[in-house]
Swiss-Prot record:
Induction pattern: Induced 2.4-fold by hydroxyurea.
UniProt organism field: Escherichia coli (strain K12)
Membrane topology, record value: Peripheral membrane protein
Protein name: Ferric siderophore reductase
Summary of the function given for this chain in its UniProt record: Siderophore-iron reductase which is involved in iron removal from the hydroxamate-type siderophores coprogen, ferrichrome and ferrioxamine B after their transport into the cell. Binds both the iron-loaded and the apo forms of ferrichrome.
GO CC field: cytosol; plasma membrane
Keyword set, alphabetical order: 2Fe-2S, Cell inner membrane, Cell membrane, Cytoplasm, Iron, Iron-sulfur, Membrane, Metal-binding, Oxidoreductase
Pfam families reported in the protein's UniProt record: FhuF, FhuF_C
Length: 262
């Protein structure tokens, strides 16, 4: 059944926001982002009070709230084509691209440049949503993940996968409208792109090592399946997305420049 508009924040019980525990880490991450990718600070707030309508994953992923968010987003996407049959899979795929696309780059920058590892567990993040239903900004209660601090860049990226990304994919897959593999495919493309963006900062050797571990190893170091495995593949000497993100099925949405269907 296609999503249509409904009251957005009905029956949401707001939880007390976590108190910041490591202001020095917040300052260091903010300074690094400001120096290298200042525009990221437009949609990630570190140890700043979150607005009351910002939600943790546990809150926005509840069936009523998520259905309302997707309904509002559907109304926005189909606003100029009201008679067109609505498709939920490409809609959720694009919604997830917004969510993960705004979340992952600053977290990669934090995890791969700081001595202390940022705790990326979902309870430390509040998402503020745009009036169109997609995410607009993340408010982060900055804490150190003492277990991840001594880890290598590869292990830190695996922490990002297991703690920050898996819960998001599982929440969206629970709608029954999308296969998580599509979201992981989009996410692999994003991470590969941002590794290229970070090459000057991290060095080519580190970036290539991370690419191999993230995209060409079938399992993570803990033995679990690697959801990013072969989400990008080598074609004509370049790593490219393996599957289409499906946005071409939505009205008035710009197609990817390197769409696999071309």
């Amino acid at each position: 059944m296609a999503y249509r508009s409904a009251p957005l924040y009905e029956d949401v019980i707001w939880r007390t926001h976590l108190q910041p525990q490591d202001p020095t880490l917040a300052q260091a991450v903010r300074a690094t982002i400001a120096k290298h990718r200042e525009h990221l600070l437009e949609f990630i707030r570190l140890d700043e009070p979150a607005p009351l309508n910002a939600m943790t994953l546990a809150q926005w992923s509840s069936p009523n709230v998520l259905s309302s968010l997707l309904a509002v987003y559907s109304d926005h996407i189909y606003r100029n084509q009201p008679m067109m049959i609505r498709e939920n899979k490409p809609l959720i795929s694009l919604w997830a691209q917004w969510y993960i696309g705004l979340m992952v780059p600053p977290l990669m920058l934090a995890l791969l440049t700081q001595e202390k590892a940022l705790d990326v567990s979902p309870e430390h993040f509040h998402a503020e949503f745009h009036e169109t239903g997609r995410v607009a900004c993340f408010w982060v209660d900055v804490c150190e993940d003492k277990n991840a601090t001594p880890h290598s860049p590869q292990h830190r990226m695996e922490t990002l996968i297991s703690q920050a990304l898996v819960p998001v994919v599982q929440a969206l897959e629970a709608t029954g409208e999308i296969n998580g593999k599509l979201i992981w495919s989009n996410t692999g493309y994003l991470i590969n792109w941002y590794l290229t963006e970070m090459k000057q900062l991290l060095g080519e050797a580190t970036v290539e090592s991370l690419r191999h571990a993230l995209f060409f190893e079938k399992t993570l170091t803990n033995g679990e399946d690697n959801p990013l495995w072969r989400t990008v593949v080598l074609r004509d000497g370049l790593l490219v997305r393996r599957t289409c993100c499906q946005r071409y099925r939505l009205p008035d949405v710009q197609q990817c420049g390197d769409c696999t269907l071309k």
